[in-house]
Amino acid sequence: MVKILKPGKVALVTRGRFAGKKVVILQNVDQGSKSHPFGHAVVAGVERYPLKVTKSMGAKRIAKRSRVKPFIKVINYNHLMPTRYALELDNLKGLVTPTTFSEPSQRSAAKKTVKNTFEEKYQTGKSAWFFTPLRF
């Protein structure tokens, strides 16, 4: 059987606090681990999407509206719905691992790095679909 949930794949969260949010898979664990005895993925997603920007807005207002609030989480495969999209995040692959979640300072540092990476991606204009909220 072909593995669908691979690193770099964009998925939607279907259950829980972040239901309906878009995430990108950073690392997948098919067999499970001691702390999570089921197939799961370490994901980074967008908790708060950037707001709409128009030409008439000033630079300061555009900068405020272009902020992205990320989250990192370990999610069961059953709660992820894969999409056809992929997102290239080479600098995040080794940064967020299952051990990152044990230490709060590591977690916040990882979130800051994810935030910077997401904002860079958003500023370039590529992967625009990832940074728009899902309408349903």
Curated annotation (Swiss-Prot):
What subcellular compartments does it reside in? Answer: Cytoplasm
Q: Which PROSITE patterns match?
A: RIBOSOMAL_L27E (PS01107)
GO process annotations (BP): cytoplasmic translation
Q: Which key words tag this protein in UniProt?
A: Cytoplasm, Ribonucleoprotein, Ribosomal protein
MF-aspect GO terms: structural constituent of ribosome
Family, per entry: Belongs to the eukaryotic ribosomal protein eL27 family.
Role played: Component of the ribosome, a large ribonucleoprotein complex responsible for the synthesis of proteins in the cell. The small ribosomal subunit (SSU) binds messenger RNAs (mRNAs) and translates the encoded message by selecting cognate aminoacyl-transfer RNA (tRNA) molecules. The large subunit (LSU) contains the ribosomal catalytic site termed the peptidyl transferase center (PTC), which catalyzes the formation of peptide bonds, thereby polymerizing the amino acids delivered by tRNAs into a polypeptide chain.
Name of the protein this chain belongs to? Large ribosomal subunit protein eL27B
Q: Which species does this protein come from?
A: Schizosaccharomyces pombe (strain 972 / ATCC 24843) (Fission yeast)
Gene behind this protein = rpl2702
